[in-house]
Every structure is written in structure tokens, then in C-alpha cells.
């Protein structure tokens, strides 16, 4: 694998902007990699009726998921002006059954995005303000002695909800940050030897300030790896900021306390839980899975990388690609889905060497290079 010297990160760069990422021979076209009739589970089971949950996703179901997801995105953007791509990432991460990390400076709408997502889903939500004195039991729950019954009773923590907003997660100690690990990966919490399952769906939307800011701790690698995707908000464009100022400083409807109260539920948690299960049925061909493995291997063996994409990162990329395909109304994954999702899914997991960082290179530069030099098939 050739390794050209990395150049400084360009925030406007996109994997699809590099011609090398789409240059493949005609015989190895997307149809060979993506079409569900090529080696699909359904064709290999001819004559054997499989359970409904094992069947490939029907086109009608995919269209329904796409329409409902778009309605949620549009509802979020009624408050988060000018950021449809960020709202889309948030909904996509939910459909992929993952968790979202939003890293940016204070005051750009990270918390508002999480609140709008929960409101548009009609989901229960809890918010934890992470501070240095926050304890793990505040997150997961604890056993409390009940004097009336002379027994210990479990008092659930904030994770017992459907959308958990972990606000400024990197202001708490690493011990408290790690309290979320089991909940994020296993969808359960173990306290005093007893395991308690979490709700469906369950999604953590964590906000984090840049680590250079005062009073922040770096998120442990194990926790960063459990976030399916990472995104940033950025400053709004001028026109969107004007509309935001008008909405947030003008009168509110009677009964509303803040602007997020105007967000309407466009779906239900039960429907989204079913959509999450349906997305897992989107077809990804063996050649496409091999392409993802080659991409992961390229990051692991790159001389300017100290920590490449983990097997969990590869799993998350395939799940995100499936959700991306479904939001486009398709029932199978194409290479373009993988390329579209590799940045938000892998960028926050990679560690570059000090030499690469000293030249101003970033993880996005490395992923651009990997996409250019890794053949699709």
C-alpha cells in the first residue's frame, strides 16, 4: 500500500470529491458489490423458508423508513437552522443502533440538537450535566437502603431512558465517564451483581468541548470507540443565524417554555425500535464486507498511524452504511454508502504519530488517502 505524505486537514474535503475513490473496473461494478441478488441470503436458501426477521428488507419497508426519517430530520431543522447534514447524522446513528458524539465549542447548539432529536422521536429523555464531582452511581443508579422495609432497593440512574443527553461528557472524571461503557455496548447496567436491561431504543448523545479548554478530560479510547459516529456543529451561516435569533428571542407559544417545545413528534419510539431491527436486514454483499476489511487493515498498517480502526469500528461502519442506504430508500449497501460514512464513523477513533501531527495532518487526511489507495474490489 503506497503511503503518500499526509497534508493538513481540510474541513471541506469529502471522500466523494476524490476521483480515485470511484475508479473501479466495469466488471467489478457496484452491482457486483451491492445488488442483493448476487449471493444474497435469500437466493442461497431457495426452498427453505426462513423466519421473517432473517429475510432481506422489502423495498416498501425501506421507503417507509426513509420517509419517516426524513420527517424527523425536517422537524429537527425547524429549530437547528441550516444544519440538515448534522440532523441527518443524528437520525442515521439512531437507525444504526449506535451512539453519537458531538464535539465542538460551547454555544453552537449541541445540547439543542440532542433535545430536538428526542422531541421529534417522541422519546423519553434524560439529561446529565457532567461535572468533576459527578459519581458513577449518578449515571447508572445505586442500591439505596429503605428504612421502611429494611431492605436495599435499586434506584435507577439517568441511563434508564430512551435518549440520554450526556452534556459536556469530558468535564467529568474518567471513572465517571467509564460508567457509561456497559450501558452503551451491552444495553444493560449491572449494579451490586444484578443486571438491569435498558429501554429500546436507547441512544446516548454526548456533547464534548475541545480538550484544550479549561476543566476538560480526554475521553478514554475505549469510550470513544463505543460512539458509532462523531460530528461537529460549526457556526451557522448568516441567514440561518438570523432566523435562529428571531426564533429564540421572540415570543413563544402559550404553554411552551423554550423553543424546543415547538418540536412535534413525527414518529414513536416503538416504530424507531422496529426500524433499527429492519436496518440490520439491509443486504451487504461479501465483496463489500471485504472492502470494509481492506479499509480497516489499511489504517492499521499505515506508518503514520499508532491506533487504527478496530474490529468494532468496522462493524459500526457497516451498520452506518446500512442505515445510509435505508435513508436513501435502498435495501442493499453500495460502496458509496461506505465512503459517505467512513469520516464520521472512523475519524474520532484514529491516532496519528507525533510526526504526522507536527506536520498539521489529521485523521481526515489519512482516511482520504486510504480511500484513494484501497481498491473497491
Each model region followed by its residue ranges:
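C-terminal engagement/docking regions of AAA+ P-loop ATPases
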Residues: 3, 24, 35-59, 63, ...
Amino acid at each position: 500500500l503506497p503511503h503518500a505524505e499526509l497534508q493538513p486537514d481540510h474541513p471541506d474535503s469529502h471522500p466523494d470529491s476524490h476521483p480515485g475513490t470511484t475508479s473501479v473496473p466495469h466488471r467489478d461494478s457496484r452491482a457486483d458489490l451491492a445488488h442483493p441478488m448476487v449471493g444474497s441470503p435469500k437466493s442461497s436458501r431457495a426452498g427453505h423458508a426462513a423466519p421473517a426477521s432473517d429475510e432481506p428488507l422489502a423495498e416498501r419497508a425501506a421507503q417507509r423508513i426513509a420517509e419517516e426519517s426524513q420527517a424527523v430530520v425536517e422537524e429537527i431543522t425547524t429549530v437547528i437552522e441550516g444544519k440538515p447534514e448534522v440532523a441527518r447524522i443524528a437520525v442515521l446513528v439512531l437507525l444504526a443502533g449506535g451512539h453519537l458524539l458531538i464535539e465542538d465549542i460551547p454555544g453552537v447548539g449541541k445540547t439543542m440538537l440532542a433535545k430536538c432529536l428526542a422531541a421529534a422521536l417522541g422519546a423519553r429523555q434524560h439529561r446529565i450535566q457532567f461535572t468533576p464531582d459527578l459519581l458513577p452511581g449518578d449515571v447508572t443508579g445505586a442500591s439505596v437502603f429503605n428504612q421502611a422495609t429494611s431492605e436495599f432497593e435499586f434506584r435507577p440512574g439517568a441511563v434508564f431512558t430512551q435518549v440520554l443527553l450526556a452534556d459536556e461528557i469530558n468535564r467529568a472524571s474518567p471513572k465517571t465517564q467509564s460508567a457509561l461503557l456497559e450501558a452503551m455496548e451491552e444495553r444493560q447496567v449491572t449494579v451490586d451483581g444484578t443486571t438491569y436491561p435498558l429501554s429500546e431504543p436507547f441512544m446516548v448523545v454526548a456533547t464534548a468541548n475541545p480538550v484544550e479548554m479549561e476543566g476538560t478530560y480526554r475521553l478514554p479510547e475505549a469510550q470513544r470507540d463505543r460512539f458509532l459516529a462523531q460530528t461537529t456543529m460549526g457556526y451557522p451561516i448568516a441567514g440561518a443565524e438570523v432566523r435562529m435569533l428571531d426564533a429564540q428571542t421572540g415570543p413563544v407559544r402559550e404553554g411552551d417554555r423554550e423553543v424546543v417545545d415547538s418540536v412535534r413528534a413525527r414518529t414513536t419510539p416503538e416504530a424507531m425500535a422496529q426500524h433499527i431491527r429492519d436496518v440490520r436486514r439491509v443486504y451487504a454483499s461479501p465483496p463489500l464486507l471485504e472492502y470494509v476489511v481492506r479499509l480497516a487493515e489499511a489504517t492499521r498498517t499505515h506508518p503514520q498511524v499508532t491506533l487504527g480502526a478496530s474490529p468494532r469500528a468496522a462493524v459500526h461502519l457497516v451498520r452506518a452504511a446500512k442505515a445510509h442506504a435505508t435513508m436513501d430508500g435502498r435495501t442493499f449497501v453500495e460502496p458509496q454508502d461506505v465512503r459517505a460514512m467512513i469520516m464520521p464513523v472512523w475519524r474520532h477513533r484514529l491516532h496519528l504519530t507525533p510526526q504526522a501531527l507536527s506536520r498539521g495532518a489529521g485523521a481526515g487526511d489519512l482516511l482520504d488517502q486510504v480511500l484513494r489507495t484501497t481498491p473497491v474490489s
